[in-house]
Amino acid sequence: MRIDNTSVFFPAEEGGPTALLPDIEEGVTAFHFSIQLDERFPLNYDHEYQIVFIETSDGSHVFGVQLGSPFTNPPGPLPAPNAHSFKVLDHSLNVLFSAPSSPRSWHNFAVLVDWDNLTLKVYYSKDGAPLKPVTGTIPNLSVSPGGPGKGEFHFGILKLPLVDPNDSPSDQGDVVHHGIQEGSTEGLFYSGVFVEKVTKGVSTGYGKTIRP
């Protein structure tokens, strides 16, 4: 999957989108995905990249996976110290788990979401290794219970801009309409993306499961 200068957003008033969403966000579900860096089209780690997330109706994320330097206004030193690490975030943007990215390696994740008890748990492995839990069960209590706390499962490359010093102070925090975007072609590889309803165990690979 790649992003370049043709990856633009259209204002919401230009159309009224409709979509059919699967009813998967109930009970306990595990969101599985594997990601590999694209060395031909490297990311610019001065930027923040939101690469997997569940977006609720208010624009917040039940959980998210981030690469690059978190957007701040005013900006700090770039790239940030953890810019080259995958970071799994909760709804309040706390980092639950991080893993250094490495070229030519597949980074495998499963994020377990308990929709009733509002908790998260992260599983991770590299390449062909089976998934293992890398966190305990963590409260995610800032997310709204019920329907408002559910949303759309996204995987892709959402690149936030850098602050443009020529913008007005009020515009410098508007990441949708303002900021610096170089327009270079950048990419990631995705594989093994699926959602699993968890009753007795979480799939870890090779037909095996582990108790949640």
Residue ranges and their predicted role:
Residues 123-142, 154:
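Juxtamembrane loop segments immediately following a transmembrane helix
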Residues 102-121, 127-128:
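Localized edge beta-strand/strand-to-loop motifs within extracellular or lumenal beta-rich domains
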Residues 81-86, 118-120:
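Repetitive beta-architecture junctions, highlighting loop-to-beta-strand starts
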Residues 87-108:
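Short, aromatic/His-centered strand-loop micro-motif at the edge of beta-sheets
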Residues 60-63, 94-98, 129-136:
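Surface-exposed loop/edge segments in extracytoplasmic proteins
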Residues 77-80, 98-103, 112:
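Short, conserved, surface-exposed binding loops centered on an aromatic residue
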Residues 1-81, 90, 139-212:
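Low-complexity, Ser/Thr/Pro/Gly-rich disordered linker/stalk regions
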Residues 34, 87, 110-112, 121-123, ...:
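Beta-strand cores of modular interaction/reader domains in eukaryotic scaffold and signaling proteins
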